[in-house]
């Protein structure tokens, strides 16, 4: 999940750069929203990843 948050963050940054340079001025507002949305998602997922630890292994007991 953290992988996808990073991918979408990069896409939002690239879209923002194109939008601010005038190539796609209509996409500027959308790029701003996406940028901040994915920054928040990145921070939340990073905190969950750091605080979550590793889950305990599941032990299957066969009768």
From Swiss-Prot:
It is found in: Cell membrane. The chain crosses the membrane at residues 4-24, 33-53. It is a multi-pass membrane protein. Keywords: Cell membrane, Membrane, Transmembrane, Transmembrane helix. One of its GO terms (cellular component) is plasma membrane. Pfam families: DUF1328. Belongs to the UPF0391 family. This is UPF0391 membrane protein lpg2415. The lineage of its organism: Bacteria, Pseudomonadati, Pseudomonadota, Gammaproteobacteria, Legionellales.
């Amino acid at each position: 999940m953290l992988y996808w948050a990073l991918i979408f963050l990069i896409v939002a940054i690239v879209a923002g750069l194109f939008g601010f340079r005038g190539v796609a001025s209509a996409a500027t507002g959308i790029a701003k929203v996406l940028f901040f949305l994915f920054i928040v998602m990145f921070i939340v997922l990073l905190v969950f990843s750091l605080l979550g630890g590793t889950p305990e292994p599941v032990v299957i007991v066969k009768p």
